[in-house]
C-alpha cells in the first residue's frame, strides 16, 4: 500500500498462490487507523466482501470497470433486471426468475421455469442448460457493489483511479527492475 505521493505505507508478504482478495484483510487491518478517505485498488480486489468492509468503515472504494465474463451471443447479467419488491429477476423475454436458494459462497440463486423458457424465442441467447432453466446469481452484499459502481461513475473518480499507475504501479515496476524480474 502507498499514499498519494507513492510512498510505501505498509506491506504484507503472502504466498503467490493466494488470490489478492483473500490477502486484503491482513493489510487493511494494518492500515485501518491512518484515516483513509479512498481505497483505490485493481480488479483483483473487486469483491462484495471488500466493498462491504470499506463502505462500512466510511471509506470510498474506487474499483475499476470489470468486463462481464459472458459467452459471446448470450445475454449479460445486466440485461436481467432485478425487481427488489418481488425479489426476482426479469429476463429479456419478460419472465420472472424467482429466488431458489443461497449457496455457501453467499450468492442467492434465481431460477427460471424450464417449461416457460423452453418455448421462449430468446432461449438460445439465454442458456444452454438441458432442462432449459436459467440461473442468475446475486450476492447477499450486491447492494454494496452497486454503491461502488455509483462511486466509480462519480465526477473525479476516473481521474483519481488513473493515479494508480503513477503511484503503486511505479513502485512495483521499480522493484521488478531493481531485482531483475524483467524479461
What are these regions (language model features)?
Residues 1-183:
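Anion-binding and metal-coordination hotspots
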Amino acid at each position: 500500500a502507498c499514499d498519494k505521493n507513492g510512498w510505501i505505507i505498509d506491506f504484507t508478504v503472502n504466498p503467490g498462490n493466494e488470490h489478492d482478495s483473500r490477502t486484503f484483510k491482513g493489510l487493511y487491518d494494518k492500515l485501518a487507523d491512518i484515516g483513509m478517505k479512498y481505497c483505490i485498488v485493481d480488479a483483483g480486489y473487486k469483491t462484495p466482501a471488500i466493498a462491504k468492509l470499506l463502505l462500512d468503515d466510511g471509506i470510498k472504494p474506487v474499483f475499476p470497470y470489470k468486463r462481464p465474463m459472458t459467452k459471446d451471443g448470450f445475454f449479460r447479467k445486466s440485461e436481467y433486471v432485478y425487481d427488489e419488491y418481488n425479489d426476482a429477476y426479469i429476463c429479456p423475454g419478460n419472465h420472472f426468475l424467482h429466488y431458489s436458494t443461497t449457496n455457501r459462497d453467499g450468492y442467492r440463486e434465481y431460477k427460471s421455469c424450464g417449461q416457460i423458457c423452453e418455448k421462449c424465442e430468446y432461449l438460445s441467447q439465454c442458456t444452454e442448460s438441458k432442462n432449459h432453466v436459467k440461473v442468475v446469481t446475486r450476492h447477499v452484499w450486491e447492494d454494496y457493489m452497486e454503491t461502488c459502481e455509483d462511486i466509480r461513475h462519480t465526477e473525479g473518480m476516473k481521474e483519481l483511479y488513473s493515479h494508480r499507475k503513477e503511484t503503486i504501479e511505479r513502485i512495483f515496476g521499480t522493484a521488478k527492475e531493481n531485482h531483475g524480474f524483467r524479461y
